[in-house]
A protein has these predicted regions:
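Active-site-proximal binding-pocket segments
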Residues: 226-426
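Active-site "lid/cap" and pocket-lining segments within catalytic core domains
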Residues: 1-271, 281, 389-512
Length: 512
C-alpha cells in the first residue's frame, strides 16, 4: 500500500494535528520535514530562529519515533525533495496545513502545487488555526474563528505503522545545518514538551497577574505565557491554549476572592490576545502585498526608504541611541529574542517617528531578532506602529515617559545597559542631563562611557507629527481607509477609518 505523505511545516507537533489525523484515515503515513536553505537566506531569518526550529524538529522526531514512524528529514529544495520521495514511495496524496507566511513560502507553495499537478498528486491543506482562506471581508470572521477554536481537539495518534526508516535520524540531519549570524544566539527552548510546560505554568501560577504585569518589561518576562514562538512554529495549537485557558477561567468565574478576580480578568485578556494573533495573520493571508507595500496605499511614498539615515539605523541596531530605556529594550531583544508587546511597539514607533526609518528596514532588523517571528503579525504590526495602515491610531511614544512609567527605579535599564549601573535613579532615565561632576562621581561620562543621545526625543517627535499632519492634509486618504477597514478591520470593535470621520481605534496588545 502506498503511503500518504504528511508535510510538516510550521506545525511541529502530533497533538491536535489535522493533517496527520486525516492522513492516517487514508493509510500509513510518511512524515516529512524539509530544511529549505532558500528560506533561511531571507533577511527576516536568523540562527536564533533556526535553533528553536532545530530543537522542535528533534522533539517532533522523538514523538513520531515513539509512535512507530520516525520523521524523514531532508535539506534542499522542496520540489526536488518531493520528487526523490515520490520516485521511492510513489505516494499519490500529500497532507499539510495551510501556511500563511512571507512571500518566499507563498511562491514555494505555488511551485509545490504545480509539481503536484504535474504528477497527478492530490495535495490536501488543513487549517492550522483561525485564519480563513478566500476571505473578502471581515463580516463573519470572528464567528468563524470561534467555531474553529471551540471545535473538539484532535487526539494524538495511538500509533503510526512503520513505512520506512530514514537514511539518517532527524537530529543528525539538522545538526549539520548552520544558519550563521553574529550576535543572535539566545533563544527559548523549542519543542512540544516545552510548550506544554509553559502553558501549564502560566495557567497554574504565572498568569495570575498577567493583565496588570504585561506592560512592564520587569514583570512581563514572567507573567506572559511566553508561548509566542511555539505558536509561530506550531509546537502547540492555538486551539489548545484557547480551550485550556477558557476552562481555567470558567473555574474562577464563580469565585468571589481577589485572587479569582485577578485570574478571571487575566485569562479573559489572554483569550483576547489569542484572537488578535489570528486576526493579524489574516491580514497577510487576505493581502500578501503588505509584506512589501503599505496597507493603506495613500501612504506609499510617505517616509521613503531613501530618507532613512543609516547612522541612525546603525545606532538602533546596536542599542546605542543614548536613550537608556530604549537602548535597554533593544539590547534585551537582541540578546534574548523576546520583549513584551508594549516595548516592541515603542521600538517600532521610535524607529519610525523619532528616527524616521522606513518600516521595511525596521521589519528586517526586528524580524531577525524575534524568536517568535510570525510574518502575518510582524508586517501588520510594524506598519500599524509606523502609522501607515489608515485605520489605527497613530501613536508617537514618548521614550522618557515610557521609561519612567515602566521602569521607575531603573532596574531594567541597569540590567541591560550596565554602563549606567552606578548612575543614581534620579538621572538614569536622562543621563545626558546629569552634571559633569556627577558623571565623574559615578564613573560614567556621557559621550565616552555611554553615547550622547541621538537627538532631543521631544523635538524629534514634534517634527514627525508635523510631517504626518502635512501628509494627511495634502492627500485624499478617506476612500482607501474605507477599503482597508472593510477588508481588514475587526468587527469586535466599532473601528472607524482614521480619515474623513472621527476615529476610534484603541491600541491593541498582542502579548501572549
Amino acid at each position: 500500500m502506498k503511503p500518504v505523505l504528511v508535510w510538516f511545516k510550521r506545525d511541529l507537533r502530533v497533538d491536535d494535528h489535522e493533517a496527520l489525523t486525516y492522513a492516517l484515515l487514508e493509510g500509513p503515513v510518511l512524515p516529512v520535514y524539509v530544511v529549505e536553505p532558500g528560506y533561511w537566506a531571507n533577511d527576516y531569518t536568523s540562527g536564533r530562529q533556526w535553533q528553536f526550529v532545530r530543537e522542535s524538529i528533534a522533539a517532533l522526531d522523538a514523538e513520531l519515533t515513539g509512535l512507530g514512524q520516525p520523521l524523514w528529514t531532508a535539506v534542499g529544495d522542496m520540489v526536488e525533495v518531493l520528487e526523490r520521495l515520490h520516485s521511492r514511495f510513489g505516494f499519490q496524496v500529500m497532507h499539510s496545513h495551510q501556511e500563511t507566511g512571507p512571500d518566499w513560502t507563498f511562491q514555494r507553495d505555488r511551485a509545490v502545487k504545480a509539481w503536484c499537478a504535474s504528477r497527478d498528486i492530490q495535495w490536501i491543506e488543513h487549517k492550522q488555526h483561525g485564519v480563513i482562506r478566500g476571505l473578502s471581508d471581515r463580516a463573519r470572521w470572528s464567528r468563524q474563528w470561534g467555531a474553529v477554536m471551540d471545535a473538539p481537539r484532535l487526539a494524538r495518534p495511538a500509533a503510526l505503522p512503520l513505512v520506512a526508516r530514514p537514511p539518517k535520524p532527524a537530529v543528525d540531519v539538522v545538526a549539520h545545518v548552520s544558519i550563521a549570524d553574529e550576535r543572535l544566539v539566545g533563544s527559548q527552548p523549542g519543542g512540544s514538551i516545552e510548550a506544554e510546560a509553559l502553558l501549564n505554568s502560566f495557567l497554574e501560577t504565572r498568569g495570575e497577574r498577567y493583565r496588570g504585569g504585561m506592560s512592564s518589561p520587569n514583570t512581563a518576562e514572567t507573567v506572559c505565557s511566553r508561548l509566542s514562538p511555539h505558536f509561530a512554529l506550531g509546537t502547540i495549537s492555538v486551539r489548545t491554549a484557547w480551550q485550556e485557558s477558557q476552562a481555567q477561567r470558567a473555574r474562577f468565574q464563580s469565585e468571589k476572592s481577589a485572587e479569582a478576580k485577578r485570574w478571571s480578568a487575566s485569562l479573559k485578556s489572554f483569550g483576547s490576545r489569542l484572537h488578535w494573533h489570528c486576526h493579524f495573520i489574516q491580514k497577510l493571508e487576505t493581502e500578501p502585498r503588505i509584506e512589501f507595500e503599505e496597507v493603506h496605499r495613500g501612504f506609499i511614498g510617505f517616509r521613503p526608504i531613501e530618507e532613512t539615515r543609516l547612522d541612525r539605523l546603525e545606532r538602533f541596531e546596536q542599542g546605542l541611541l543614548g536613550w537608556p530605556f530604549v537602548d535597554a529594550c533593544l539590547r534585551c531583544l537582541a540578546q534574548t529574542g523576546w520583549l513584551n508587546f508594549r516595548m516592541r511597539a515603542m521600538l517600532v514607533a521610535v524607529a519610525s517617528y523619532h528616527l524616521w526609518i522606513n518600516w521595511r528596514e525596521t521589519a528586517h532588523v526586528l524580524g531577525r531578532w524575534f524568536t517568535d517571528f510570525e510574518a502575518g503579525i510582524h508586517f501588520s504590526q510594524i506598519q500599524m506602529q509606523s502609522g501607515v495602515t489608515g485605520i489605527n491610531a497613530n501613536r508617537v511614544y514618548a521614550p522618557i515617559k515610557q521609561s519612567m512609567d515602566q521602569d521607575p527605579d531603573g532596574r531594567f535599564i541597569k540590567r541591560w545597559v550596565p554602563e549606567l549601573e552606578a548612575v543614581p535613579v534620579a538621572w538614569v532615565h536622562t543621563p545626558w542631563r546629569m552634571p559633569v561632576s556627577m558623571q565623574h562621581q559615578c564613573g560614567c561620562l556621557i559621550g565616552r562611557d555611554y553615547p550622547e543621545p541621538v537627538g532631543d526625543p521631544v523635538q524629534m517627535a514634534r517634527e514627525a507629527r508635523e510631517r504626518l499632519t502635512n501628509w494627511i492634509s495634502t492627500h485624499d486618504l478617506s476612500g482607501e481607509a474605507q477599503r482597508v477597514l472593510k477588508q481588514h478591520g475587526s468587527r469586535l470593535r466599532q473601528a472607524r477609518p482614521r480619515y474623513g470621520k472621527k476615529a476610534n481605534s484603541p491600541q491593541l496588545s498582542l502579548d501572549v
